[in-house]
């Protein structure tokens, strides 16, 4: 299974399901919008495999994009176990997501 984050209608990032779920959970953590947190957790809990950032409110979308650009890769470097198979490739995929978010 895989998952996709639509950063914009023409900018999509896909990854293995576990990495998609890790990213969505990380993005949901500590958001100020309870409804957005519930929606993001539902995506993971129900194995929906899709997060469209345009479906979020403008304020939440801006915050999620900021986190993708500035926090997600560093967090992966800290949290993903060094023994994780293909760890460097997973972090590189998150870098790709960060680059997509730069101009969104």
Residue map of PLM features:
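Acidic (Asp/Glu-rich) sequence patches and key acidic residues
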Residues: 1-103
């Amino acid at each position: 299974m895989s998952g996709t984050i639509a950063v914009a209608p023409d900018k999509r990032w896909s990854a293995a399901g576990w990495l998609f779920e890790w990213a969505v959970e990380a993005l949901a953590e500590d958001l100020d919008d309870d409804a957005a947190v519930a929606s993001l957790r539902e995506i993971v809990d129900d194995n929906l495999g899709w997060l469209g950032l345009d479906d979020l409110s403008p304020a939440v979308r801006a915050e999620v994009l900021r986190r993708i650009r500035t926090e997600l890769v560093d967090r992966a470097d800290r949290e993903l176990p060094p023994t994780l198979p293909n760890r460097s490739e997973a972090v590189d995929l998150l870098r790709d997501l960060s680059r997509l978010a730069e101009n969104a």
